[in-house]
A protein has these predicted regions:
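Glycine/proline-enriched, intrinsically flexible loops and inter-domain linkers
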Residues: 1-154
């Protein structure tokens, strides 16, 4: 699984003894600037059998830099939610590279870094008279969206 390709979660769950608990946009992780950095993602996996994850990720220590005055993106992080022998749970930072062994019910959270921004936000505001630049996300419309929204209401 990579950060550049979105694999089908159903295939992942079929091939490996893992349950995908979360796969979402990491809002606010992109750098601030005239052209904001892209958002990272959050992926959470729960082991359904004893298993080993091999991690090879970057930008966990050093944040993705911005260019031409743009702000840096947020760094990524990899966390494991482990079960202790006394029944308690403990969060562990597993770093950017290495091996993580999980027992059934334990979880691995992968927060990918946000992208660095390009261009100074202050200069863009002065040049364009823009009060504030916000991320815009696609919103569904039309009959299919209305049908799906109706099905999810009750």
């Amino acid at each position: 699984m990579t950060n550049t390709r979105v694999s089908d979660l159903e295939i992942l769950e079929k091939r490996y003894p893992v349950l995908v608990k979360q796969f979402s946009i990491r809002h606010g992780s992109g750098g601030i600037g005239a052209h904001p950095g892209g958002s990272g993602s959050i992926r959470a996996f729960e082991a359904r059998a004893p298993m080993t994850f091999s991690l090879s990720s970057e930008r966990r220590t050093h944040r993705p830099y911005g260019m031409n005055g743009g702000g840096p993106g947020k760094s990524g992080r990899n966390l494991a939610l482990l079960h202790l022998p006394d029944g308690k749970k403990r969060w562990a930072n597993v770093g950017g590279k290495g091996i993580v062994k999980l027992q059934p019910g334990e979880q691995l959270y992968v927060h990918t870094p946000g992208g660095g921004a390009w261009g100074s936000l202050e200069e863009a505001r002065l040049a364009n008279g823009i009060a504030e630049k916000k991320h815009q996300y696609w919103r569904g419309t039309g009959s299919l969206h209305t049908f799906a929204a109706t099905q999810n209401e009750g």
